[in-house]
Amino acid sequence: MRKFSKFVLGLSLVGACACVSAAQDKSIPKVLEIQREYLKPGRSGAVHQKAESAFVSAMARAKWPTHYFAMTSLSGKTRALFLTSYDSFEAWENDSAAAEKNAALSAALDRANYNDGELLESADQGIFVFREEMSLRPRPDLSQMRFMEVRVFHVRPGKEKEWSEVVKMAKAGYEKGLPDSHWGMFEQVYGGDGGTYLLLSSHKSLSEIDKAFASDKNFVAAMGEEGMKKLDEMFASCVESTSEQLFAFSPEMSYPSDDWIKSDPGYWKPKTMAAPKAAAAEKTDKP
C-alpha cells in the first residue's frame, strides 16, 4: 500500500525542516491522502492482510513518524482504502522526500509493493483538502471508531456557490433536528474530476446507522415542508451524481500512532503487528 508520492518530490523544497504531522493527532487534517486498492477476486481478507503487514513492519522498523489507517469495503467493489493526513502540502512533500532518502525503508516498501501488486486489480490515489465550513462537528480522534460512511458528491461545473448554500442549509437542519450528527467534508484537489466532495462520517457501531435512519424524520421536521422543497430543488440543480459506501476499519493493515494503540491496544495492536519481522527476513527474493 504505502507509496510515497513522486509528484511532491518535484516541488520546491522550501523549509525542509518543517515538522511532518502525525496522521492521527487530535486535530482535523488539512490535507488528506487516500490510496485505494481494488482486489482481485479471492485476494481480500487474510491474504491481503498478510501482504500489508510488510508495509506496517517496514514503517515500524523505521520508526516512521507519519501514520495511516486502513479500511475495507462493506459495499461496492472489493477494495481497501489507506488514509494518511498532513498539516500541509509542504509536510506531505517533506515526508516523501525523507522516505526517499531512507534507503532501508525505500527498499522494504519496494519489496512490499511488488508482492502486494500481485493481489491487485487496480489502484489509484486522491488528494483532498478539509472544508471546515462544510463540516459539522467532525471527530478529530477516530481511535474508538470502527466504521466509516463515505459519501461522494459530484457538483456540476459553475454550481459551487449553489452547492455551498445546499450544505449550509443541510447543516442548519441537522444541527436543529439531529444534534448528534457529525461529518467531515473534504474537497478533492488532485487525482479526480473537479467538483468532487467527500463526506466522511465515522461510527463506533453500526447501531448508530440504525438510529440515524430512525431519526431522519427529525431532520425533515427541522427543515419544514418549504425548506425541504427548496433543498431538494437546489440539490438536484447543483449535484450531478452521488454515491454512498460503507467501510470497516482494519487494524491489521493500519500503522496507528502510539496514542491510538494506547486507547485500545487489544484492537489497534493485533498479534500480526506485535513484533515486526527481523530485517533479514525482508531480504527474500521477489517471486
Task: Enumerate the predicted regions with their spans.
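Bacterial N-terminal signal peptides
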Residues: V8-A18
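Positively charged n-region of N-terminal signal peptides that target proteins for export
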Residues: M1-K6
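Short S/T/G/P-rich N-terminal loop/turn motif that feeds into the first structured element of a domain
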Residues: A22-P287
